[in-house]
């Protein structure tokens, strides 16, 4: 019991000593309380849209500089080339007999109009008639056409089938008949023109040329 009392006394002394030491210090006052500012209310975060991905820039090619236009001169229309046709060499004729000159008659006879004067059984020169009908004579303009060239070859083949002594008379009669059918005119003018064309046709086919009229050089007509 006495020990308990001693312990309580010691505790009381220790407590009093501790309170005296605490209250009787340097006499400093405690610092005033610190006033903190009120809290700042931040705005809510702004949700930005996602970034837009733009396409890469298109690089245009540099402009093309065209050359200035070239002024082309108008085409020059050249005249058609002259007609060249092969001439066949004349065949040797077995002593041709002289034939009467058709231009000695101022007016054509009926046999000359029919193209059968002195021919007898000579075949009709149908291709030569077509040759003259298409105005394919050597003095006409469309003489160089392919149709005229074909008719010319066929006409020359038919002329070679005629006997030499009757060949010129046959072609003269055909030419004279064709002239009078196309352009009616006087018999003397038609006869001279037919003689000229007949000579050109025989030369064109490479055949023997007829003998000229004895009065043609003097320019007269026998009576």
Swiss-Prot record:
Subcellular localization, as worded in the UniProt entry: Vacuole, Aleurone grain membrane
Single GO MF descriptor: nutrient reservoir activity
SUPFAM superfamilies (UniProt xref): Bifunctional inhibitor/lipid-transfer protein/seed storage 2S albumin (SSF47699)
TM spans (from-to): none
Domain of life: Eukaryota
GO CC annotation: aleurone grain membrane; vacuole
Entries under Gene3D superfamilies matching the protein: Plant lipid-transfer and hydrophobic proteins (1.10.110.10)
Keyword hit for Transmembrane helix: no
Mapped Sequence repeat ranges: 31-36, 37-42, 43-48, 49-54, 55-60, 61-66, 67-72, 73-78, 97-104, 105-112
2 X 8 AA tandem repeats of Q-P-H-P-C-P-C-Q as annotated region, ranges: 97-112
Protein name: Glutelin-2
Record organism: Zea mays
């Amino acid at each position: 019991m006495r020990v308990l009392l001693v312990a309580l006394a010691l505790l009381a002394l220790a407590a009093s000593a501790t309170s005296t030491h605490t209250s009787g210090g340097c006499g400093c006052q405690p610092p005033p309380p610190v006033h903190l500012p009120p809290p700042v209310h931040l705005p809510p975060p702004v949700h930005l849209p996602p970034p837009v991905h733009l396409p890469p820039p298109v690089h245009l090619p540099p402009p093309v500089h065209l050359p200035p236009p070239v002024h082309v001169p108008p085409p020059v229309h050249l005249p058609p080339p002259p007609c060249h046709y092969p001439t066949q060499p004349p065949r040797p004729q077995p002593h041709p007999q002289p034939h009467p000159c058709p231009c000695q008659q101022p007016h054509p006879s009926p046999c000359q109009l029919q193209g059968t004067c002195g021919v007898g059984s000579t075949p009709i020169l149908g291709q030569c008639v077509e040759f003259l009908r298409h105005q394919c004579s050597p003095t006409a303009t469309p003489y160089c056409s392919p149709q005229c060239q074909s008719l010319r070859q066929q006409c020359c083949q038919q002329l070679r089938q005629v006997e030499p002594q009757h060949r010129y008379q046959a072609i003269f009669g055909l030419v004279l008949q064709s002239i009078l059918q196309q352009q009616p005119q006087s018999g003397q003018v038609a006869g001279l023109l037919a003689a000229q064309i007949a000579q050109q046709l025989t030369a064109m086919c490479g055949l023997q040329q007829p003998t000229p009229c004895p009065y043609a050089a003097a320019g007269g007509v026998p009576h």
